[in-house]
Amino acid sequence: MAAVNSIDKEGVRNLFSMDFLKILLRGSGQVMFQNNAWTGLLFLCGIFWGAYEEGQPLVAWGAVVGLIVSTITGYLLALPREDGREGLWGFNGILVGCGFMTFLGSTFFTWLALIICAALTTFVRTGFNNVMAPWKVNSLTFPFVFTTWLFLMAARVMKGLPPAFMSSPHLPGDFSEAINMGFGDLLVYWLKGISQVFLINSWVTGIFFLVALFVSNKWAAIWAAIASALSLFLILIFKGPGSDIENGLYGFSAVLTGIALGTVFYKANYKSAFVWCLAGIVITVFVQAAMNVFLTPIGLPTLTGPFCVATWLFLLPLFKFYGSPEQQPDHSQWHKDNKSDPGAPDLN
């Protein structure tokens, strides 16, 4: 277990350096498993574009606050510096920032709670990873999901945290499956499935994210595109809720599953990554639907919970493919090939 008994004073002194900026950007990139500062920068550009386009600029600024707070917390807790250099303290925090300002009204107490929750994710991530280590999986984005659920539930009884944009608790009922099915419409739904990874409802942001992924890892971009398309196809043929389809809400967890299984935890080859990644994407769509039904009566969003559940389902069995070590899952924190940041200086 990482020592949490003293402040990383050297790290704190570097908070206003260019190295710290790169660490923040990598934290943004690590939401989709990319340890690349340029990718993180493009993700932030996409977040700002989509947030302002949708008239929700505070979502973008919440993302920045969450990213900074969760990263600084890693230094304050003196967590392993390698995790910090790779941006692994920041990715849950940036999602917390997006989530808070998507679902809660903006008050002083909302921002205070955002700071507390973002800081908590860094601590919780360490704990969850310690618990999951014997199973050879990690917590993925579940620290964001778990802590945000806690605060969103608390908002129901705390007037300082107005649940202004949360759905009211209700039992699942009838819904309309009718949507426009033109090629342009389907293209928008597909791109929104990618943009919703950061809770952004913008097809332009989806383009930003695809370009950002391609800058770091072309296969990550390809799997993101495939995952969003396949999840869209599945929810259409199974006649899911039209409003959810139009807003890309069945795509974002599948996108994360596709990247995770296709480029991170399974070695990229036809027999392992391709087969199991496609299976994981399919399962994610059904997990998404099931979790929607499960959480609707308490008025909670699924966030990236379906991605976590589906990915764990495909990692926990410790599959061994065809007896070849090269085709077996990589159960390390992240695949070593995704830890490089071409052109960036060594931060040691």
Q: Can you name each region flagged by the protein language model?
A:
Residues 1-79, 193-197, 206-216, 301, ...:
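N-terminal signal-anchor module of multipass membrane proteins
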Residues 15-23, 30-42, 63-64, 84-94, ...:
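Short hydrophobic alpha-helical membrane-embedded segments
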Residues 46, 50, 58, 62-74, ...:
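Alpha-helical transmembrane segments in multi-pass membrane proteins
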Residues 53-56, 76-88, 106-111, 127-137, ...:
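Membrane-helix interface "capping/anchor" motifs
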Residues 77, 81, 128, 132, ...:
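Membrane-interfacial segments
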Residues 86-89, 93-174, 296:
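Membrane-interface helix-loop-helix junctions at boundaries between adjacent transmembrane segments
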Residues 105-106, 154-163, 238-248, 286-297:
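Hydrophobic alpha-helical transmembrane segments in multi-pass integral membrane proteins
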Residues 147, 152-229, 233, 237, ...:
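Generic multipass alpha-helical transmembrane bundles of integral membrane proteins
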